[in-house]
Amino acid sequence: MHIKDQLKQLKPYQPGKPIEEVKKEYQLDKIVKLASNENPFGCSTHAREAIQAELEHLAIYPDGYSASLRTELAEFLQVNEKQLIFGNGSDELVQIIARAFLDQHTNTVIPSPSFPQYRHNAIIEQAEIREVSLLDGGAHDLKGMLDEIDENTKVVWVCNPNNPTGNHLSESELVAFLDQVPAHVLVVLDEAYVEYVRAEDYPNSLSLLHSYQNVIVLRTFSKAYGLAALRVGYGIASEELITAIEPAREPFNTSRIAQAAARAAIKDQDFIQSCRQKNEAGLKQYQEFADRFGLFIYPSQTNFVLIDFKRDADELFHALLKKGYIVRSGKVLGFPTSLRITVGTMEQNAEILSTLADLLQGIRA
């Protein structure tokens, strides 16, 4: 058997360490996972009720077109139903876009470091990858990205807010960028963390779709909506673009349970508002910690923080594991002296920050 050569240079995506694995490895009873940017407050009670009701229909295939969810979401977003595409998480939409646009004769422009699946899927499609380093402070180098675009560029990825830094692009910055991107290039606006954004200058990306036919916006129910286990994401673009890429989508790619939970979750915006407020309070806890120890914390519009500790990230990562805290080492994210930490509950934040304070004071002693 011959496997595609490009697969030999890839490894499967490595998420944060599983809780049970850490319990077993370190003989711990309590584990706090702050690695995968999950919602520490769970999901809406309405979503739980919808999941329970859907258990009666597990023998029946889901609606492959997600018609009911499509109608609910289109009304909520104030877009045409035909402007939507659904995926098994927004990860699948990244894969669909790469499959639809990229091949060995094309190139794609990617900010770096950013979400690794952009690069991963481009490699599978044998496209040339043009990575543009982030600016100091973690923002996209939009000028550098524009400089990499040529006649063979098919897709440009913009992660806003960016993962793993949490930085955001303003509407004026994004519009100035889009004005200079050639019409033959698809611009993907990955807005996985949009529900957490507080910045007043954050782009109204859906309104931009009217002016830029070469833009698709990706969002997910995995983060603020707390439905990560169910895997449901969505894309919004022009009807023509959605129609063109739909054939690359797998049939029945979002489950009955996922569709039902997402429909219910959309209707509970009080839950989202509550999570946003609690997350903002949590971000302040981390900012105060960084100020106390003179550490640089990247300006986050998400539910995670990236903190530069100016020391080997893996050492701190393993020290926290031994204490029962799972975070992400910046070494695997392109920031070798930083940790990415999900904002948890007030209590979780206080506990891990107390542990980090003890570790830092021990190192400095």
Curated annotation (Swiss-Prot):
Residue(s) carrying N6-(pyridoxal phosphate)lysine: K223
GO MF annotation, one: pyridoxal phosphate binding
Biological processes, Gene Ontology terms: L-histidine biosynthetic process
A Pfam family that the UniProt record links to this protein: Aminotran_1_2
EC class: transferase
Cited CDD domains: AAT_like
Complex and partners: Homodimer.
Family statement: Belongs to the class-II pyridoxal-phosphate-dependent aminotransferase family. Histidinol-phosphate aminotransferase subfamily.
Record PANTHER family: HISTIDINOL-PHOSPHATE AMINOTRANSFERASE, HISTIDINOL-PHOSPHATE AMINOTRANSFERASE 2
Protein name per its UniProtKB record: Histidinol-phosphate aminotransferase
Organism: Bacillus pumilus (strain SAFR-032)
